[in-house]
């Protein structure tokens, strides 16, 4: 359990860094938190986010740029609203990752 808490804290620290108007994928957050295989762990951590004011979990989308249908803090439409308030444009619930993805990546994320 101690490692799980540590993993969650690493994930929250990465998500805190995602700038307004940008998004990151679950896999990107996982890699930046230290393990590119943690994509599902990122989802679990964000679902129980203890501080939505300072940990902007709505800025995390899947690898296709889709918002979460199970967004824990108001549902899919709320996640879309929050992203749009920051200037992120969505088409059919999708974010254009080429335009809005946060550029911070790691060698591990790139698979090198």
Go through each PLM region and give its residues.
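Nucleic acid-binding interface residues in structured DNA/RNA-binding domains
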Residues: 1-112
